[in-house]
């Protein structure tokens, strides 16, 4: 609880910098609006599946894989912050503001691999759009929402089949590249949907453990680029404010939480 409170304080501090840049650029902050069908009452895991399907429908996403989830959520008015975290993979928060609607924030762990970041983003989105009832475990419901949001049931069944005695590692790697999720998340999803049974699930996880995929640094094959799900909007706004001479280099570096030298190096990379 203490770590979560400290993390929330850091997130609020970073959010204030984010909103400052928007104000300096005289931009109207994109406000979070609940999807039309939310909040979804979740009395069992099927309701979590339905919630994910409804959010995709409300946002016009169809059943296609989502290429960049952090970018999509920022377009929807959620501020995505990437911080160095220890014990926590992520959290969602609502920060009240004077004279404006509350800002919605999702914090993700900077050092996580991209597939994990994507799942955590979808999990935290789940917390924002579902309303568990009847003793349903909220974490499990958010997890199920995340799996359904990133790997729609109909698409996965069409790709894999409805009932399988086993799935090859090669097949899982191909599906991982298609959906942008970890092999382990895919295997859990196949079990949740009844595509594989508990015995097949256990056999696969034994192979994952033997290959070292179950422990840090989680070196699965065909892992996505680490920066793919790093939020980019705040940094872009800082560069824009600098280019428009709204702020100087020292202020831009301060807002980004880096040294002027590091800022210069980043600007050189952007220009290259």
Feature locations, PLM:
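Active-site hotspot residues in diverse enzymes, especially metal/ion-binding acidic/histidine motifs
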Residues: 1-272
């Amino acid at each position: 609880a203490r770590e979560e409170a400290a993390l929330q304080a850091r997130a609020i501090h970073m959010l204030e910098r984010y909103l400052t840049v928007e104000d300096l650029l005289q931009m109207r902050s994109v406000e979070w609006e609940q999807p039309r069908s939310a909040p979804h009452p979740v009395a069992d895991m099927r309701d979590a599946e339905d919630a994910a399907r409804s959010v995709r429908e409300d946002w016009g996403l169809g059943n296609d894989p989502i290429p960049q989830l952090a970018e999509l959520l920022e377009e929807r008015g959620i501020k995505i912050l990437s911080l160095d975290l220890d014990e926590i993979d992520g959290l969602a928060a609502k920060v009240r503001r004077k004279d404006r609607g509350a800002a919605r924030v999702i914090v993700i762990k900077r050092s996580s691999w991209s597939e994990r970041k994507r799942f955590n983003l979808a999990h935290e989105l789940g917390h924002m759009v579902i309303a568990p009832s009847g003793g349903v475990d909220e974490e499990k419901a958010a997890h199920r929402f995340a799996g359904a949001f990133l790997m729609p049931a109909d698409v996965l069944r069409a790709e894999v089949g409805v009932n399988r005695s086993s799935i090859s590692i090669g097949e899982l790697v191909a599906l991982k590249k298609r959906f942008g999720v970890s092999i382990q998340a895919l295997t859990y999803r196949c079990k949740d949907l009844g595509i594989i049974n508990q015995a097949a699930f256990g056999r696969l996880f034994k192979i994952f453990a033997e290959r070292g995929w179950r422990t840090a640094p989680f070196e699965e094959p065909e892992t996505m680029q680490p920066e793919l799900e790093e939020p980019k909007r705040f940094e872009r706004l800082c560069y824009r404010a600098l280019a428009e001479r709204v702020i100087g280099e020292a202020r831009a570096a301060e807002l980004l939480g880096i040294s002027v030298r590091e800022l210069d190096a980043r600007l050189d990379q952007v220009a290259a």
